[in-house]
Swiss-Prot record:
The enzyme's E.C. designation: 2.1.1.170
GO CC terms, sorted: cytosol
Keywords, sorted A to Z: Cytoplasm, Methyltransferase, rRNA processing, S-adenosyl-L-methionine, Transferase
Species assigned in the record: Klebsiella pneumoniae (strain 342)
Protein name: Ribosomal RNA small subunit methyltransferase G
Major localization class: cytoplasm
């Protein structure tokens, strides 16, 4: 699996240390093991996880501005855990409302010795952002409007929302809550992943 990950990283033009590669493979191993009992992801094949979970997460790392991020609706830690591995200088709060997912995240944190993640069990509307975050990341929300509406209290004044999407649909981007606009739409190229992938960056219009 390490060889396959290395090939995928080469295809994507991403350079990681051997330690980071080993951490990513270990994370896939834990996800595969826990998935059998906890049903954390619909992806059952570890090799497919490398593409659909690992590469699809870390491909956005160069576009994140700041050092404090929150991954809302992180599920089994996606994209937060892979991003924390490839950006050890940044801190990631991993927010999910389901206890079984947060228990898994704490196990990952323990086994991989990740000191730059904080798993939290909470509903997003009940979670206080103190201090606020540089970036709010998610691939869990059905719509951009929902993401901004539910998470508006989380970013700092100069912070951004980062939504990992398949299609970047014009009507969805035009239907943001009042006061917010699209800062950037980045087309992502994930090796061996079929279909379009985009990173939609949202910020307050006052900036």
């Amino acid at each position: 699996m390490l060889n396959k990950l290395s090939r995928l990283l080469d295809e994507a033009g991403i350079s990681l240390t051997d330690h980071q590669k080993n951490q990513l493979v270990a994370y896939v191993g834990l996800l595969d093991k826990w998935n059998k009992a906890y049903n954390l992801t619909s992806v059952r094949d570890p090799n497919e996880m490398l593409v659909r979970h690992i590469l699809d997460s870390i491909i956005v790392a160069p576009y994140l501005q700041g050092s404090r991020f929150i991954d809302v609706g992180t599920g089994p830690g996606l994209p937060g855990i892979p991003l924390a591995i490839v950006r050890p200088e940044s801190h990631f709060t991993l927010l999910d409302s389901l206890g079984k997912r947060v228990r898994f995240l704490r196990q990952v944190q323990h086994e991989l010795k990740l000191d730059n993640v904080t798993p939290v069990q909470s509903r997003v509307e009940a979670f206080p952002a103190e201090p606020p975050f540089d970036g709010v990341i998610s691939r869990a929300f059905a719509s951009l409007n929902d993401m901004v509406s539910w998470c508006h209290h989380l970013p700092a004044a100069n912070g951004h929302f980062y939504a990992l999407k398949g299609l970047a649909q014009k009507d969805e981007m035009e239907n943001l809550p009042e006061g917010y606009g699209i800062a950037e739409v980045i087309e992502l190229h994930v090796p061996q992943l079929e279909g379009e992938r985009h990173l939609v960056v949202i910020q307050p219009k006052s900036r």
